[in-house]
């Protein structure tokens, strides 16, 4: 995925039976992806490392280690690292079918 590195923790293949998934993603790029995530369910994020920006539809806001936020169902979302900062690493979780 280019400047994104994803590690999956839970999926339907290893324990989630209702369509849930969780993992970590490292966002090394300082640009927002032109292919944001969009899901039929909400997705929660917790920032583990780094500093950057999250974009939910047209809303852009700063994020840093210790922050958390939720992308509601159907909301396009993407993350980028702030220039000159450590890459943003997030833990994410979403569930439902």
Give residue ranges: language-model regions.
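A generic structural signal for short beta-strands and their flanking turns/coil linkers
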Residues: 18-23, 43, 50, 73, ...
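Short acidic-glycine-tyrosine-enriched beta hairpin
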Residues: 58-73
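A short glycine-rich, His/Asp/Glu-containing loop-to-beta-strand
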Residues: 1-36, 95
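Ligand-binding loop in jelly-roll beta-barrel domains
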Residues: 73-97
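A generic beta-sheet turn/junction motif
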Residues: 40, 56, 83-85
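Short, conserved beta-strand element in jelly-roll/cupin
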Residues: 26-27, 37-54
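Histidine-centered metal-chelating micro-motifs
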Residues: 32-34, 53, 69, 73-79
């Amino acid at each position: 995925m280019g400047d994104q590195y994803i590690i999956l923790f839970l999926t339907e293949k290893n324990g989630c039976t209702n369509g849930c998934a969780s993992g970590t993603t490292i966002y090394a790029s300082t640009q927002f992806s032109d292919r944001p995530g969009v899901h039929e369910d909400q997705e929660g994020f917790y920032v583990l490392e780094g500093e950057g920006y999250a974009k939910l539809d047209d809303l852009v806001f700063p994020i840093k280690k210790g922050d958390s936020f939720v992308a509601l169902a159907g909301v396009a979302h993407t993350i980028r690292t702030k220039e000159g900062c450590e890459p943003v690493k997030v833990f994410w979780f979403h569930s439902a079918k």
